[in-house]
Amino acid sequence: MIELQNVYAWGIDGKDAGQFRNVFTDDVDAQYTTLMRMQGREQLSLWLETFHAPYDGTQHLFTNFAFTSDDDGVLMRSYVVANLFVHAYPGGENFVSHGYYLDRVVQAEDGWRVRSRQIINLWREGNVGLLDVGQQAVQNSR
């Protein structure tokens, strides 16, 4: 199951949508902020690809994995540090978000997949204006 986070991070940071989209079930339910919730692998994958595309670099680091099994699969909790970078961006080139992911992981025909995801942001540092770069890309794609 840890491999799911690794594949997700390498796919996002390598701008490889084909890689990270396979981490999720078809009916994934994902809440990336308190204001944004996406349902379905296609909607989530498109948003992730579009949001991260304009950055000169991103790096997602996962640690401190914890697992709890129940009848609905496995609850996987992991710390995340997500870095966004845009060269020569006004106000600062870097933004870093610290928090954790709460993932409901289920066994699918082709291996473990994330069925639900909630991101809990604990604190942020750097130029929060860099989030506008990804959000503007999403707005422009509509």
What is the predicted role of each segment?
Residues 10, 34, 91:
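Short, charged/polar micro-motifs that form catalytic or ligand-binding hotspots
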Residues 17-82:
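A solvent-exposed, acidic/Ser-Thr-rich amphipathic alpha-helical stretch
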Residues 53-142:
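A beta-strand edge to alpha-helix "cap/lid" segment located at domain peripheries
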Residues 1-10, 14, 18, 22, ...:
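Short, low-complexity N-terminal intrinsically disordered segments enriched in polar/charged residues
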Residues 14, 43, 102:
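Short, flexible micro-motifs
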